[in-house]
């Protein structure tokens, strides 16, 4: 059986509860293909969160829905999760974070999750938005304060930045591999002024391209 909810805006609730409504429905007795077709048809005018019993069922439905629409997101959580196992599945965590920040950008989407994912405590949109770091070239920032903020939003310091969720520093340079990005970025400072923002290859450490601004999304769900 699948359970799904339709959208209605609410304040001071988690991002999922702001995204959906109390109008809830359950469907059963359909093939996986028909479930995907039915959910996609209901999505035309409403945002939907679909809750399955297990992660396996959620993944199957997500893959089916992707063949009908690009407006589908996945929020996976281990079915038998304990507090000691929170860091066991970094790939699932990255997928969850990408889904949360996609919802910040665009409300009208389908979200597929399993029961444990739906029960996961999540912050409000306001809390998530307040943790995003926005940087622009030729603007002034206190480098030490910026490093502290990067650490506070879930990034791990390493000697070399090559994996999503890591950052490193040397002199007036901060390297960071933000979630939602295919490559890490290099922040080069001249004093307190952000002199350049560049994508670089995580393997060769060579510059790929420059950009004028960047948003660094938190690497944490809380």
Question: Would you name each region that the model predicts?
Answer:
Residues 1-222:
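ASCE RecA-like P-loop NTPase motor cores
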């Amino acid at each position: 059986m699948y359970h799904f909810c339709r959208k209605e805006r609410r304040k001071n609730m988690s991002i999922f509860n702001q995204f959906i409504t109390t109008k809830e429905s359950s469907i059963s007795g359909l093939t996986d293909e028909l479930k995907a077709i039915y959910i996609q048809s209901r999505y035309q005018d409403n945002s939907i969160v679909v809750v399955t019993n297990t992660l396996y069922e959620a993944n199957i439905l997500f893959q089916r829905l992707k063949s009908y629409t690009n407006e589908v997101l996945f929020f996976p959580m281990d079915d038998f999760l304990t507090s000691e196992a929170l860091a066991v599945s970094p790939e699932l965590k990255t997928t969850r974070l990408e889904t949360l920040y996609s919802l910040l950008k665009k409300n009208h989407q389908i979200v597929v999750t399993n029961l444990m994912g739906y029960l996961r405590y999540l912050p409000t949109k306001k809390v998530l938005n307040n943790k995003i770091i926005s940087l622009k070239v030729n603007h002034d920032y206190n480098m030490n304060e910026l490093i502290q903020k990067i650490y506070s939003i879930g990034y791990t310091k390493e000697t070399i930045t090559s994996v999503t969720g890591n950052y490193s520093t040397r002199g007036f340079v901060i390297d960071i591999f933000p979630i939602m990005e295919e490559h890490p970025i290099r922040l080069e400072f001249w004093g307190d002024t952000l002199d350049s923002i560049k994508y670089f290859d995580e393997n060769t450490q060579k510059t790929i391209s420059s950009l004028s601004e960047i948003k660094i999304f938190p690497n944490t769900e809380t």
